[in-house]
């Protein structure tokens, strides 16, 4: 999954 906001990508689980 690619988060729209890479500025806060840490909020998402990097896959």
Curated annotation (Swiss-Prot):
The answer to keyword RNA-binding applying to this record is: no
Keywords in alphabetical order? Secreted
Q: Where is the signal peptide?
A: none
**Family per record:** Belongs to the snaclec family.
- The record lists the organism as Protobothrops mucrosquamatus (Taiwan habu)
Q: Which GO terms describe its cellular component?
A: extracellular region
Protein name (Swiss-Prot/TrEMBL): Protocetin subunit alpha
Q: Which domain of life is it from?
A: Eukaryota
Where does the record place it? Secreted
- Expression sites (tissue/organ): Expressed by the venom gland.
Q: Does Plastid show up as a keyword for this record?
A: no
